[in-house]
Amino acid sequence: KSRHGIVLAKSTLAKQYGIVTGEPLFQARRKCPGLVVVPPNYQLYVRKSDQLIRMLHEYTPLIQQYSIDEAWMDMTGIQEAQADPMGFATGLKDRIHRELGFTVNIGISVNHLLAKMGSELQKPDRVHTLFPEEIPQKMWPLPVDELFFVGKTTAAHLHKLGIHTIGELARTDPRLLEMHLKKHGRAIWKYANGGELDAAVFERRSSKNKGYGNETTLPDDVTDMETACQGILSLCETVGARLRQDNMKISVVGVHVKDNSFTERS
């Protein structure tokens, strides 16, 4: 009956029941009473991530790791990849599955944004191309919230403007988007048209531990300040311990809250 814990990742089958990443486990179990829940094993993820990156370096030194399970490979000048991109990527995908024991999706294109979007087209264990000439057919029909860097809040703003697909976003006057979403509006308009990611995206990922954080899902709704402060104190103690371990100091503290309707405030 406790709602402790959230969904960190879900299988393709669980997704068919409407289970989404970030929702409390008690809600996920309502959607799928027979749900199998496996506790996370972060050290295993780190080890497998390291093995994957080492394998990718066997093919090219130009690797940009975006997260624990995402990386871009620059295959410019790699003759085998240039001659048969789909064949090369399929071979790499199969090798990862065979030697490391997990499946991956690979997207192929001319820039980071399109390769990332290509990798998300259909899962699991797939290879997709998303070249500029394929954008109208493959990317524009997708819901706008599937575009890289369009989160729930931005998607809600776009829906109010009558923008529901990536194609509609691509055809919107960027000045209108800037009026409502500032610089982010023009950035996502560029992405909707297949433009390259901004350099700041990679700069934010280039330095480790620019920020320290911790989060939890409380077992019950909290409506009084004392209980809320106790929860925040517990999180602060964990973050403080990590800061002391790394001999770091901070200048800004932020608190992020999500209520039971998934409305976020910070």
What are these regions (language model features)?
Residues 1-187, 203, 241:
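Gly/Gly-Pro- and Ser/Thr-rich, intrinsically disordered tail segments characteristic of DNA damage-repair
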Residues 146, 156-266:
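DNA-contacting surface of Y-family translesion DNA polymerases
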